[in-house]
Amino acid sequence: MSDQTYVEYECTHQTFRPLPRYPVRWLEWETDYPLVQLFWPEQTPEGWQEARREGYQYCAQTEHDQIQAMAAVWRYSEAAWEVASVYTRPEVRGRGYAKAVVAFVTATILGAGKRATFSTASENRAMQRVAERVGF
């Protein structure tokens, strides 16, 4: 049994602060697989399809033909979707890429009329700061 604790957040239209500094787009497995493989070598076509079946869709901020940061929307219920699987390349952390992908996913969730949720490990202060800056 894990002793890990999590901090849970919710963002609303009133609290949301979009951060349009970097362009972010949805990833398509068929065309973006080479980029995904460089960023996330463990991901397989089967794993990607399984994630899609479980309600995940991934987006990325790309620069210089590389994914700099990635996040997903997890459509876990009819009423609420979660910002999930946020990761930034270690060598480019602190540049706002995580905020860009989190804001992109959050805007998608709120635009669909769903509750936007987010959770992270209680000791992950960097991710908590990102969430708070976006309006969670």
Ranges and model annotations:
Residues 46-89:
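A conserved beta-strand-loop-helix scaffold within acyl/acetyltransferase catalytic domains
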Residues 86-93, 121:
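A short, internal acetyl-CoA/4′-phosphopantetheine-binding micro-motif in the GNAT/acyltransferase core
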Residues 23-35:
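A short beta-loop-alpha structural element at the N-terminal edge
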Residues 1, 99, 122-136:
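Conserved active-site alpha-helix within GNAT-family acetyltransferase domains
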Residues 1-22:
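Acyl-donor-binding surface of acyltransferase catalytic domains
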Residues 91-92, 96-101:
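Conserved acetyl-CoA pyrophosphate-binding loop and the N-cap/start of the following alpha-helix
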Residues 1, 109-121:
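Conserved GNAT acetyl-CoA-binding A-motif
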Residues 83, 101, 105-109, 127:
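Short hydrophobic clusters on alpha-helical segments that form packing/core surfaces
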